[in-house]
Amino acid sequence: MFGLRLAQASAALALAASAGSALAVGLGPLEKSGITSSERKGLYLTVSNPYRTAHNFRVFVEEDSGIAPGRVTIHPSTATIASGAHRRILVIVDGLFPGEEVNFRLCAERIEERRVTVHARVCSKLGARRLRPAR
């Protein structure tokens, strides 16, 4: 009887531990685009911390996502966010030519201080388009 309860308690603890590590940073909206008449376009996104304690997060352009990372500026690209809190970030796309449209993926993840089993991240699909001059 005691052994059965101990096994149930161990299983519950293992499930709770695995569920806690499977949480992922929040990033929204998951898709956003905008139009500009200048060579720069800014977009606001929100990073959320679903964990029970404050953590450090980073936001970055996904490799091979269709834009050179040097054309994108992220303010801030790293931040400490309190438990259950949100932080707005500004993403600026630079060097847009008239008529050019760029699409890329921007990702957010928790900065891990140790090796973890599940490395969770979330990505948004972003787009920016520059208008052609009127004739």
Task: Indicate residue ranges for each PLM-predicted region.
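Bacterial N-terminal signal peptides that target proteins for export
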Residues: 1-10
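Short acidic, flexible loop segments centered on an aromatic residue
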Residues: 50-68, 108-110
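Cleavable N-terminal signal peptides
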Residues: 9-12, 22-23
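Terminal connector regions
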Residues: 95-135
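Short, solvent-exposed loop/turn segments enriched in Ser/Thr/Gly
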Residues: 37-44, 87, 99-105
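Beta-sheet-dominated interaction scaffolds and their linkers
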Residues: 23-47, 78
